[in-house]
UniProtKB/Swiss-Prot annotation:
One of its GO terms (cellular component) is vacuole. Pfam families: BetaGal_ABD_1 (PF21317), BetaGal_gal-bd (PF21467), Glyco_hydro_35 (PF01301). One of its GO terms (biological process) is galactose catabolic process. This is Beta-galactosidase-1-like protein 3. GO terms for molecular function: beta-galactosidase activity. Its EC number is 3.2.1.-. Belongs to the glycosyl hydrolase 35 family. The active site is at E227 (proton donor), E301 (nucleophile). The keyword Coiled coil does not apply. It comes from Homo sapiens.
Amino acid sequence: MKSPPLLSPCLSWKRMAGIFFLPFISSGFAPRFKQEENFMLGRAHPSQPRFNWSHLTPLELKNRSVGLGTESTGRGKPHFTLEGHKFLIFGGSIHYFRVPREYWRDRLLKLKACGFNTVTTYVPWNLHEPERGKFDFSGNLDLEAFVLMAAEIGLWVILRPGRYICSEMDLGGLPSWLLQDPRLLLRTTNKSFIEAVEKYFDHLIPRVIPLQYRQAGPVIAVQVENEYGSFNKDKTYMPYLHKALLRRGIVELLLTSDGEKHVLSGHTKGVLAAINLQKLHQDTFNQLHKVQRDKPLLIMEYWVGWFDRWGDKHHVKDAKEVEHAVSEFIKYEISFNVYMFHGGTNFGFMNGATYFGKHSGIVTSYDYDAVLTEAGDYTEKYLKLQKLFQSVSATPLPRVPKLPPKAVYPPVRPSLYLPLWDALSYLNEPVRSRQPVNMENLPINNGSGQSYGLVLYEKSICSGGRLRAHAHDVAQVFLDETMIGILNENNKDLHIPELRDCRYLRILVENQGRVNFSWQIQNEQKGITGSVSINNSSLEGFTIYSLEMKMSFFERLRSATWKPVPDSHQGPAFYCGTLKAGPSPKDTFLSLLNWNYGFVFINGRNLGRYWNIGPQKTLYLPGVWLHPEDNEVILFEKMMSGSDIKSTDKPTL
């Protein structure tokens, strides 16, 4: 298939874009197109006026019947329609679970004010069903509240519900308890996997049904699966998911999204295929044309930036390149979704990882060099896209919300500390097992195992030698309280010196994020997998502590006997200090330049991981998570104590 011809210089692309920027046009208008030799490009009448978009919003459109559809006639190229009117999707991604609920409205208003008409979001299974059969749609996970807020603001919604979402999340958004059974095959019609999917759908989809367009809601489309073409191991899986959604009452447009080279293996019959890409080029739509020549083009993810990994560089993308690409989408009548409009944060242990020869964890920030920053600030990309969208609009865009000021608080100097070994008694009852048990198979959390955090394996030994263990992702090895080495994917052996007396062998293993892409997800069990041996003799009789770092643990930890912080301390420990936020807390960023590796907890809430290898050097702290005046700050530092924790009003990513 040839690429689209260049737009004729006598035809104004802005005029063309004005015709198709139509989620808000007045009812009754349906522009016509002449048939082009290349079906991708239709010519609008050069004198076609711009239109007022105010009558086709979720609040204004009362009489609904047909929803978002596709149309292909001999008079023009294929296009989307909404309630019979020609429609072009200007979408932007915001993940409700990566943004404090108190800031949802602000981010959605900024999306609307930029000129977008649609918000898209993934729905993470692992967060909504953290334990098998235990569902959570409350607080920051209140999907319905987010969708209804979008409607109230005047935005349509494209919902991308998990099973698998990728999205740089731990295990691609799949619950870790699925890894308990080695016979369960992820993203297939394997009986055990399908049973879990069915139960999840039985709780999720009834919440989505009343939010659909034809139920007077804002949801105009639902994604069936995410990038299955890159995974495709079961030809019956996609048709199964398609039917599962229809059977439960999803009536809006269904779609799939895949990389441009994986559309053929990722699409399924009866579902619109969309693509994900970084830039347009000659062969962008070749595979898409092969599977659906008579359907409109939809770019489900246009990557305006990229994610970062620990030890890698910070990724940025030029704003002019983004502006040019989006103007090309408009020129060629391509519906699109900007990924990400606002990335937010991988708070807590939410981050995923990549595996391309080695395991690399995703950083805490999901800034993504997006249209809005991690803290919701405007960027050059925002200003350029807003100007572009205004140029094709018949009416002024909404006024942009004002940015609240950031704060620089006094440095926090921890005054108390608690070595990890003194905190063990405040953890839940340890597991005692003959052999090591991997994180997912620990008999805790109502049989769902441990999803995130760290796990400590303890065993008394009386002789040294060659220690061997498979630890995922990284393990610190101690004799009593003294660290003697590190185990990881590339280093499975360690020499233990000869012992005069029996000592405690302690292996502290951290999950740095499960891989979120590729078939590697099937093998992402964490902790120690397999046996632990010294001189090829397997060890037996382990005490296993789970360090999930939940808020309930920090509530218990407050009653511990903390000690004054020494000048220097090596080894894992908790450090406690106070952040003084004054009477009106504001957003800030915490700088931990003189600390090494660990996690920050504010009033028991996990902000995420810090690591001195970068690229990320600051952690975003939302002001809405701070109390007036005094706030408890606890660091779990794995290596060596630092001095103070500085507050700054600018991030270093």
